C-alpha cells in the first residue's frame, strides 16, 4: 500500500509484499435448527509473508518476514427459506518475525487475534446471476515482544483496529457440479476429460466501502543515550473504497482453482490504499 503522510506524522509507511499459506479445516457439526442450516468447525493454517518497507522518500529501508501459525473456529448459519446467511470466525495466531536492513537483523515473536461477523442476503437477478448485499465487522489485534538490535531497542506494545465493510457481490451462480466431460476419454483412469469450456466456472465482482476505526498501537525506540527515545503512533483510521473481482473453476470433482484481484482507494484519514491479488487451490476430501 501507499504512504499516507509519512511515518513521522503517524501514517503507515509504504510497503509491498507477498504471502503464501496452507489451511486445513474440518466441520465438527452439521444440523438443522428452526429452519436454519448450522455448520461449525475448526481450522489450522501455516504461512509465510515477506514485505519490503519504504522510507518517506520512497527508498527501500528493509524487509520484514513473518512465519505464522493459526488456529481458529467458525460457525455458519443459513436461513433455508430466504438464503440469509451469517459467518462467525474467531482466530488466534502465533508470529515469528525477522526484520532486515543494512546488515542488521531484528527478531521478535508475538501473538495476534481476529474476530469476524459477516452476513449477506442473495437475490436472484436471472437464473444464474446473483446480487448479494453484504455487511461485515472485524476486530483484530497484535501484541509483539520487545526486542533489540545493533542500533538500539524497540518496544511494540499492543495494537488493535476495528473495521466495518458494507458492499455487495454480483456474480454468476452456475452449477459447480463436475459433470460428464465430452472432449475426450482418459483411458488410463476410465474417466472423461473436460475441455476448458466444459469446466464449471463462476465469476464475481465485489465493490465495498470499508471504515477503519479505533486503530491504536504505539511503537517506541531508542538507545542507551538519555533522551533518545522516540514514539510513533501509526494509524489506519479512515475510509477506503474497495473493489475485488475473481473467478473460480472446478477442475476436478474435489478440486477448485480460484484467482482474485483488487484495489483499495483511501478517501479519508490514513486508511489502507493499494493493490492486491491472490490465487487459491481448494481441495475437499
Regions found by a protein language model. Give the residues of each.
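Membrane translocator/pore-forming domains, dominated by Gram-negative outer-membrane beta-barrels
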Residues: 1-285
